[in-house]
């Protein structure tokens, strides 16, 4: 896909423009310099064309350790891009950092560079504007004027990108293999970014000892063993009491958005330290999503082990995450690249279980046999009797059980029926949901069998 990198110094509105172009609020917008630290990817559409955009961190001439890492990410974006947007601000005088960015871009000889002047909402059309003339000094020709925050000039910008680069119409993907979207969550410094670097086999996400270095959710397309994946990296989740206003709170929201966009969650914990209340809170977020979870126990290489160590830690996890009893537990060492291949093995197993459709006749055979084997207890003045069951269309396995009266359902018997369905049809690694309805009720979305 044709890819455009958005480059500029801090606070010229790169993230605002990125969000406007892809029409989704993916990148965090803030007046604080260097809010964007990694490369953020998104896709915009314009007149049957699709363009991938890369939001980048702000380039400055000063070389702090963090700025050096940001510059590595920016240069990687420049190498990946087919074209470049050089973004400057109309509301401010040209700075030395603007000229530094221009100097970097002038070294690129094989890619078109489009100068875009942002924050130009007060610019009068067809009027002589002395302030606009200064931008010609960069040597990139006539600029395109936009206001990302007001949505002004975005159509003209997209027209220029399509026309200048002769982009063909997009006719849709030929892929028949559905994409599996998964995110990596966990408290700061458990090794999420290092894991992603290993999984994608390139240095895509900033790795730093500074807690909370990754702030945005980063979408990374992957293809492993013929399966398409979209890996969403997220900022480490802090305790709510420690989330500062502004950027940290926005990152927390981005993590929740990443969970909402995912099919599967990788919940990462530090195996070298005792599980904490913070881990439990994050596990609660995963449980509340009602989607499959894989628990990754990282830094297992640092643990002094005997024959019972792994079993003991699994028991602790099951106690801490009681509502994630279905979640596979994988012990890994990202640093030593140990057992990372099992992550994609588990993802494949989960995907197969998510797409599994059960014959209505087989499902009812299992339910009736379960009731014959173990009759429901008396509860609230009656005894549950399930007469019919169907699987419904949903992201995760959902089953509707028609019964004499839903109020007779005791939680222990519901768990018994759930376990029977799991055992009979191989739903070992995914959450399943049972809905008990009166036998006279109607249900939409029933799977065809």
From Swiss-Prot:
Occurrences of domain EngA-type G (ranges): 2-169, 180-355
Translocase as UniProt keyword: no
Binding site for GTP 1: 8-15, 55-59, 118-121
GO BP terms: ribosome biogenesis
Presence of keyword GTP-binding: yes
Family: Belongs to the TRAFAC class TrmE-Era-EngA-EngB-Septin-like GTPase superfamily. EngA (Der) GTPase family.
Protein name listed in UniProt: GTPase Der
